Amino acid sequence: MPAKGSAEWQGELKTGHGTFTAGDSISGEYSFRSRFEDGPGANPEQLIAAAHAACFSMALSAGLAGAGTPVDSVETDATVTLRFVDEKPTITSIALRTVGRVPGIDAATFVAAAEAAKAGCPVSRALAGVPEMTLAASLA
């Protein structure tokens, strides 16, 4: 099933503003300030971070359940870093941090499953061109 999102931008880059929607329930506003100056509103990198955290959590849960150790919960944060490279804004790193509640599993097995989820989740694969993608995984 295709996933859909849309955005509209009005005005010049530094003074304009935009709106976005993703599916039926996610929408917001964004601007130059929200993206580059910590101003109010959302930005594309936050949407990437949320998508990556969600996809990774689902992949980790599926992998653990497939190995016979279903999860009680997985909580994941993703931090997407945007820097200027060759004078162009570039996503230079993504840091995933996940904490799982998984009965009957040891830390090493959880970390191995998390690494497999990082490598295999569709969003990770779509973001394969990001120079640095790190993972910190632990059990609660």
Predicted feature locations:
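Extended beta-strand/beta-hairpin segments
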Residues: 1-50, 54-140
